[in-house]
A protein has these predicted regions:
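Gram-positive cell-envelope targeting signals
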Residues: 1-45
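Short amphipathic alpha-helical segments, especially helix-boundary/capping motifs
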Residues: 20, 56-60, 130-131
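Short beta-strand edge/turn micro-motifs at domain boundaries
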Residues: 148-173
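Generic alpha-helical hydrophobic packing signal
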Residues: 38-42, 139, 166
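Surface-exposed, charged secondary-structure patches
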Residues: 103-145
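Core segments of small alpha/beta cavity-forming domains
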Residues: 33-110
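Short, Lys/Arg-enriched charge-dense amphipathic segments
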Residues: 73-88, 117-126, 140, 172
Length: 173
């Protein structure tokens, strides 16, 4: 009798651990590290903090308007590189600078008269495109959470040096 009771307990224990392992496996499959990293990058780019404004202001000559003058982008590039770290490829950072994404977002903040904070950020995997996500968010003013703009775009992730990094970013304002 004892051996049969032991077998039932052992079988129950094995089934329990198999169920726990299955739950962990399913949870791991559901988690998408590329998407999490993409969300971080988009959040950082859309956040118009005072540090971003200062870096943009330092890059643009006094009296010029965003997008119309040559800017000293070295300081802004160094700032973004420090802010995003290993989250973007060097080529992607070059494209972000060439497309003036930080200055476009800062210009929106200037128009609203307040710092902007992204809210309701959603990322959705693009059908048929591996590691490409469509995103959308509302940019709210920091003071009273008034909607200042609706933004959308895409972000494509690649695995480089064992880490997920943004390879391309588009932004529609």
């Amino acid at each position: 009798m004892k051996s049969e009771s032991f077998r039932k307990q052992a079988l129950s224990l094995v089934l329990f651990f198999a169920a726990v392992a299955a739950v962990f496996a399913l949870t791991h499959l559901r988690s998408d590290p590329a998407k999490k990293q993409a969300e971080f990058v988009v959040q950082q780019l859309l956040s118009c903090s005072s540090a971003v404004e200062q870096a943009v202001d330092a890059a643009v000559p006094a009296g010029s308007e965003p997008g119309l003058s040559a800017a000293d982008t070295d300081g802004l590039y160094a700032f973004l590189q420090a802010q995003l770290g290993d989250a973007v490829t060097a080529n992607c950072l070059d494209k972000v600078m060439a497309n003036r994404l930080p200055t476009r977002i800062t210009a929106l903040a200037g128009q609203s008269g307040d710092k902007l904070v992204p809210a309701d950020l959603t990322l959705k995997k693009r059908a048929g495109a591996e590691n490409c996500y469509d995103f959308s968010a509302t940019l709210l003013t920091a003071t009273d959470s008034t909607a200042a703009a609706q933004v959308s775009g895409t972000i494509t992730m690649v695995k480089e040096d064992g880490r997920w990094k943004a390879a391309a970013i588009t932004l529609n304002l």
